[in-house]
């Protein structure tokens, strides 16, 4: 079965300090190309026979692994964005400032890093070490060791084999150059302002219970519904009160939009 392009797990227009244009380009071009290339590689693998040179099979399997990592990490990255509009005094996250780690997560990671501030310093420092290069920074939960680690994943493939990524930051230049140029530090700061901490906590819970990481289904975002033109017309015709806060054209043939 071919790998499908997942609906983008964040509404790009709701992010703070990250342009919709950059997120859409990242989703369509980088994530989308990874999915399409993965499917092409798997078609080649399905066609191998006894006459296939071993080096070719080895190369295809290495490429498949890298692409699988790229697809999964991109989906996790988009899935842990979108928190800026979610929090507030009644969010239950206990966060007084967007740049601070919520109390619920601070309690989770304090044992392994000493404090939330110490974790953040290491995570941010690791991300800054990749500026001008490429790779991912991951907060992972080791199911075997029952603890958290910050890790670098280069070429989409390098991470502890027992680790579940619970927070993912893309440090490839395509993730930030359009908006931030070479200023990776500003991008990292803005990333923290947009983390969906609720998604992170759900991933931690799943990892602790040896459950699959949850899919960030954008349809669960009920506070900002999307309607087609036909659905909107029907609601108006039925006399329903409708407030339009955002309207934009999409090309259905290019991608799946919410």
Protein language model features and the residues they cover:
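Feature for soluble, non-membrane regions of globular proteins
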Residues: 1-218
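Flexible, polar/low-complexity N-terminal or interdomain linker segments that lie immediately upstream
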Residues: 208-258
């Amino acid at each position: 079965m071919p790998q499908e392009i997942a609906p983008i797990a964040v509404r790009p227009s709701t992010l703070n300090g990250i342009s919709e244009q950059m997120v859409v380009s990242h989703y369509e071009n980088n994530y989308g190309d990874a999915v399409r290339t993965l499917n092409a590689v798997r078609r080649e693998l399905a066609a191998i026979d006894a006459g296939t040179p071993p080096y070719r099979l080895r190369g295809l399997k290495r490429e498949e692994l890298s692409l699988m990592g790229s697809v999964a990490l991109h989906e996790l990255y988009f899935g842990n964005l979108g928190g800026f509009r979610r929090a507030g005094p009644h969010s239950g996250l206990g966060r007084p400032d967007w740049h601070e780690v919520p109390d619920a997560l601070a309690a989770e990671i304090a044992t392994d890093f000493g404090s939330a501030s110490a974790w953040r310093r290491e995570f941010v420092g690791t991300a800054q070490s990749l500026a001008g290069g490429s790779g991912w920074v991951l907060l992972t939960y080791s199911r075997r060791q029952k603890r958290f680690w910050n890790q670098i994943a280069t070429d989409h493939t390098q991470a502890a084999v027992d680790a579940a990524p619970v927070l993912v930051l893309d440090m490839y230049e395509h993730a930030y150059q359009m908006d931030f140029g070479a200023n990776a530090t500003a991008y990292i700061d803005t990333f923290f302002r947009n983390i969906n901490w609720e998604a992170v906590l759900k991933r931690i819970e799943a990892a602790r219970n040896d459950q699959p990481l949850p899919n960030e289904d954008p349809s669960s975002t009920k506070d900002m519904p999307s309607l087609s033109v036909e659905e909107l017309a029907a609601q108006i015709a039925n006399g329903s009160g409708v407030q339009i806060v955002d309207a934009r054209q999409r090309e259905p043939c290019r991608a799946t939009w919410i």
